[in-house]
Every structure is written in structure tokens, then in C-alpha cells.
Amino acid sequence: MTADGALEFPSLRVRVDAARAAEFARETGFDASFDGAPSCYPAVWLTTPTIHGAIARICAQADSVPVHESQHFAYEMPLRVGEDYDLSVSMRREEKPPRLVVEALLATLNGAPVGRFETLLRLVPRAALRRDAVA
């Protein structure tokens, strides 16, 4: 954890998998002729056990459910299908509004910057969900 309370992870080796990129492209509305990785493809890396597990623990500690609020992707160079990259991720909580900010930097294996990504997850208290379900 950093001085400002952010949780930082060791760099993760990730790959733009051809089959997963094609599946993700179809899931996000690209037609079958699209050949590449959608710019939002790095969202799939949030499901890695390390990142997903941390999000789940933070939500459990906050007795909250994560609701996707927004994402932002900015690139220095395009993603290449079949390439391996190093992904550095940090997370921090914000109280007003209650949310989890997930920030990531993607680099080539020789350290050249590829892109920056940010995902905002609103932390909705489970008590509010139960209250709304009863109303």
C-alpha cells in the first residue's frame, strides 16, 4: 500500500489472446470482419485472479457491490494480438462518492509505454440494495 492508501500490485504479465480478443470484439458489438483487439480489451484483465480477488476483498470490507461507473483508455501505441505486455495496477478508495478507482499502466516487455487505463466502480452498500428491494 502506498502513502496515499493506494493498493499497488506487482507487475502482471498479460497477453492479448487472439481467441479472447475476437470473442470480446463480438461481445462489444464489432462485426466478424474486425481483426484486432478493441481499445477496451484491457478490461478483461480485471478478471485475473489477482485483480478480481482484490476488488472482491475491497467490496467485502465495504459491505458493498461494485457497479461499473466508467472506463477510460488512452494509448501511446495500438494493442497487438498475440503480444505479451506488463500490466501495473493500483487501486484506491474514494469516499464521496464511495467508489473504487482502478488505474493501470500497460508497457511492452522492454518497458515502452503502451497505454493508461482507468476504471471507476461505484461501491453501492448492500444495505441500500436490501432497503430498495423491500420498498
Where are these regions (language model features)?
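Hot-dog-fold acyl-thioester-processing enzymes
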Residues: M1-S70, R131-A135
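HotDog/MaoC-like acyl-thioester-processing domains
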Residues: Y75-A135
